[in-house]
């Protein structure tokens, strides 16, 4: 190594005194010795302070403890460290995790050998709450398989060039989770991310892990994409059309759009949710039933729903399922006939997705824009073990699930039927999805579809 630049390591800690000693000891044992350590206590009421003070006394010139009078939150804390960091590079180590002894050595060597790169990440071990190794996450595959733009590396133990973090304004303090996602997209086009194909830290899984709070993570991710999309805004306003295809009846489920869910019908709910989306320019209700369109018109005239477009599809298609792409292009062509302009993007919105919100629709269009994907689909993650048929019988696709682990390489997603958003040029090229497909993840609850009368009661009870 030509030089040994200083590395700033910071450890946020709130009531993780039982883990802190192992965490800090892993810093002390690094093969690379030019580091400074800042432990930040977030108003712990366990023995965090005592443990931290004892550890800092061992390296008084290199380690110090900061005590916040009230919890600052991860993003605000990170910005405060960014303001005082002396290191050329900066890395966050969570108090319940710990570093491999070679972590700093290999990451600094990588960045020093690539002066145009300002971010490096590596693999990591999963452990249980007692520190027993359960498996390994190999993050290098994210880049080698071309998915790295949409699947950022773990936010902790990713090493950044400190100057690069400062140049993009650090962390957004109103985003309370998924800090790795935000920085990844803020830095992606400014620096060249790189990786080391070795495990650099141990990631402890336990009941208090933030990564297990799915709704908080999904909400934070949605806000991040909203912020990123806004940063791309110019004087050209995208024309995004949302189409709600409506079939009047199915076998065993009559009068679908007229069915009540809470205080409104399924159609009324779908239209209002779509119109509330700040990313949607125009809403089109598409049906082969004139009765359905008349009902939509009545809803508009009564003030129950805002102004929207209505288009009658050929009645020849009444008895068959119409390909989703055809529904979307038909709506786009109708939009052109009314406005004289083709849409930039079209979103399919299922009338059956009663828990889909305007924020889900916004996120779909934001992801489509930020990731430059051809299509975005709404999905829910399959969290149960799944099998496929192989040469010797069934083969387990995601064995980590039996150890309660979620490897990125084993993540499986099911289309939940709620949203498909595609660029118009992709649809016109006779593709529904195109080549590059991104996703909006929705919770199992938000993914619920009303496909039969009995589910109306179940969904209504859930909403109480």
What are these regions (language model features)?
Residues 25-34, 273-280:
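Short, acidic, metal-binding catalytic loop of nucleotide-sugar glycosyltransferases
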Residues 41-50, 70, 94, 288-293:
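A conserved acidic beta->alpha catalytic loop
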Residues 47, 97-110, 322, 350-367:
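Acidic donor-binding/catalytic loop of UDP-sugar-dependent glycosyltransferases
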Residues 68-85, 322-327:
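Glycine-rich, basic loop-to-helix element that forms the pyrophosphate-binding segment
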Residues 90, 346:
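Short aromatic/hydrophobic "clamp" motif used to bind/position activated sugar donors
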Residues 102-134, 367-374:
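Conserved donor NDP-sugar-binding/catalytic core segment of glycosyltransferases
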Residues 131, 326-330, 342-345, 351-443:
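Conserved core of the sugar-phosphate nucleotidyltransferase
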């Amino acid at each position: 190594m030509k030089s040994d630049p200083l590395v700033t390591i910071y450890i946020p800690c709130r009531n993780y005194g039982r883990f802190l000693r192992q965490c800090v000891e892993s810093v002390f044992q690094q093969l690379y010795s030019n580091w400074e350590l800042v432990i930040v206590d977030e108003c712990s009421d366990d023995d965090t302070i005592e443990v931290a003070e004892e550890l800092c006394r061992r390296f008084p010139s290199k380690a110090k403890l900061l005590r916040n009078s009230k919890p600052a939150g991860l993003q605000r804390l990170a910005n405060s460290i960014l303001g005082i960091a002396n290191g050329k590079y900066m890395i966050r180590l969570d108090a319940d995790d710990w570093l491999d002894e070679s972590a700093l050595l290999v990451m600094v060597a990588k960045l020093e050998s690539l002066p145009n790169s300002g971010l490096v990440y590596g693999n990591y071990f999963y452990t249980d709450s007692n520190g027993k190794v359960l498996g390994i996450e190999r993050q290098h595959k994210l880049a080698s398989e071309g998915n790295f733009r949409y699947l950022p590396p773990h936010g902790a133990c990713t090493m950044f060039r400190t100057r690069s973090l400062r140049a993009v304004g650090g962390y957004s303090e109103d985003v309370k989770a998924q800090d790795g996602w935000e920085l990844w997209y803020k830095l992606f086009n400014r620096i060249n991310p790189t990786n080391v194909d070795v495990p650099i830290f141990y990631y402890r899984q336990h009941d208090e892990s933030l990564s297990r709070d799915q709704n908080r993570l999904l909400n934070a991710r949605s806000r991040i994409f909203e912020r990123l999309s806004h940063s791309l805004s110019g004087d050209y306003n995208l024309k995004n059309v949302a189409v709600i295809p409506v079939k009047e009846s199915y076998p065993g489920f009559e009068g679908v759009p007229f069915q009540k869910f809470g205080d409104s019908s399924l159609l009324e709910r779908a239209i209002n949710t779509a119109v509330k989306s700040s990313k949607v320019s125009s809403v089109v209700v598409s049906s082969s039933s004139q009765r359905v369109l008349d009902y939509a018109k009545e809803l508009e005239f009564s003030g129950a729903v805002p102004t929207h477009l209505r288009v009658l599809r050929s009645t020849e298609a009444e008895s068959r399922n119409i390909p989703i792409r055809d529904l979307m292009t038909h709506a786009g062509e109708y939009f052109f006939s009314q406005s004289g302009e083709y849409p930039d993007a079209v979103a399919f919105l299922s009338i059956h997705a009663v828990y889909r919100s305007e924020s889900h629709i916004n996120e779909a269009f934001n992801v489509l824009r930020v990731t430059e994907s051809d299509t975005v689909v709404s999905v829910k993650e399959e969290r149960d073990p799944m099998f496929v048929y192989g040469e010797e019988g069934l083969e387990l696709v995601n064995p980590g699930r039996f150890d309660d682990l979620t490897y990125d390489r084993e993540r499986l997603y099911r289309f939940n039927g709620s949203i498909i958003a595609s660029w118009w040029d992709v649809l016109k090229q006779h593709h529904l999805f195109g080549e590059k497909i991104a996703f909006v993840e929705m919770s199992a609850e938000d993914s619920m579809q009303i496909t039969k009368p009995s589910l109306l009661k179940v969904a209504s009870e859930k909403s109480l």
